[in-house]
From Swiss-Prot:
This is Uroporphyrinogen decarboxylase. Gene3D superfamilies: 3.20.20.210. Catalyzes the decarboxylation of four acetate groups of uroporphyrinogen-III to yield coproporphyrinogen-III. CDD domains: URO-D.
């Protein structure tokens, strides 16, 4: 087993005792950091940054040099899998992702390959291995993937969307076709995350960014069912240590019981959920991650500290809480604000862990 100098993140995910509440931030390696912008400029474009193991490692480590974070998260993108399937991913300057060859027909679904993670996605595994080496046991490394539903929205829509008309048209008019697509993507995610774990990821997270746009039955059938399949297929122990799995559906507060029943170790919460209620509902089954509104980081230090203390009080005593934002950090927050956030969590959480 690799020795970890700080394992409180992994312990909290498994609801084991910790000395203080661990914290990391979604998108902690990103555009709010001037050093990230410099490294991205050096890479040339976003996907070149992802594909260069040394530069991906550098941006993964940047936030850890500034803030006392309890975990590192692999720098990559959720759209690596559809890109490896041959859909032709591009990021225009100042624009969101676009696919040159979106999924529009039955034959497109049938001909979709399942990528070999150590071939088409080897650059991701190289990044994981490089980051693990450079972390040198300081904190654990989180691997991740998008959820099948969320990946399928981009694959069918051809990029970002606010209306979700194409994917929902397929869902209601051709449900069998969408299930076939989701099944293929789920199989790909299992292979991808297991390869990350073998390469050195010590925990994994599935980002279901768009699950919250679905109705109740549709969420269970078209999103959660496939995350459940992934959870069942994952390596749950590696290098003599359990590998915790976190599921995060943005807008998923209505489905906490169903998410907990997948057998995941933790549920990520957005800021619309009350942490005390979530703990009362599912805290006996899973750990909880979250859930400060990222926009609080625009506020004065005292207001950030106040929000941290409120959320800590909502969770109350005991382990099983990983502090995080309710979604990714905004790109224009002051770089001093995350330090206030992280330090406040460590300072004010200690009494809850006696």
């Amino acid at each position: 087993m690799t020795t970890l100098k700080n394992d409180r993140y992994l312990k909290a995910l498994l609801r084991e005792p910790v000395d203080m509440t661990p914290v990391w931030m979604m998108r902690q390696a990103g555009r709010y950091l001037p050093e990230y912008k410099a490294t991205r400029a050096e890479a040339g474009d976003f996907m070149s940054l992802c594909r260069n193991a040394d530069l991906a490692c550098e941006v993964t480590l940047q936030p850890l040099r500034r803030y006392e974070l309890d975990a590192a998260i692999l720098f990559s993108d959720i759209l690596t899998i559809p890109d490896a399937m041959g859909l032709g991913l591009t990021f225009g300057a100042g624009e969101g992702p676009k696919f040159d060859r979106p999924i529009e027909t039955k034959s497109a679904v049938e001909n979709l390959p399942i990528p070999d993670p150590e071939q088409e996605l080897q650059y991701v595994m190289n990044a994981v291995r490089t980051i693990r080496r450079e972390l040198n046991g300081e904190v654990p490394l989180i691997g991740f993937s998008g959820s099948p539903w969320t990946l399928a929205t981009y694959m069918v829509e051809g990029g970002s969307t606010k209306a979700f008309t194409k994917i929902k048209k397929m869902m209601y008019a051709e449900p069998k076709l969408l299930h076939k697509l989701l099944d293929k993507v789920a199989d790909s995610v299992v292979l991808y995350l297991n390869a990350q774990i073998k390469a050195g990821a010590q925990a994994v997270m599935i980002f279901d960014t768009w699950g919250g746009v679905l109705g109740h039955r549709e969420y269970l059938d078209f999103s959660l069912q496939y995350m459940h399949k992934i959870v069942n297929g994952l390596i749950r122990e590696n290098d003599g240590r359990k590998v915790p799995v976190t599921l995060f559906t943005k807008g998923g507060g209505l489905w906490l019981d169903a998410i907990a029943d997948t057998g995941c170790d933790a549920i990520g919460l957005d800021w619309t959920v009350n942490l005390a209620q979530a703990k009362a509902q599912v805290g006996h089954k899973v750990a909880l991650q979250g859930n400060m509104d990222p926009s609080v980081l625009y506020a004065a230090p005292e207001r950030i500290e106040q929000e941290v203390r409120s959320i800590l009080a909502d969770f109350g005593e005991g382990s099983g809480h990983v502090f995080n934002l309710g979604h990714g950090i905004h790109q224009d927050v002051p770089v001093e604000s995350p330090k206030v956030f992280v330090d406040a969590i460590h300072q004010y959480s200690k009494p809850y862990h006696k």
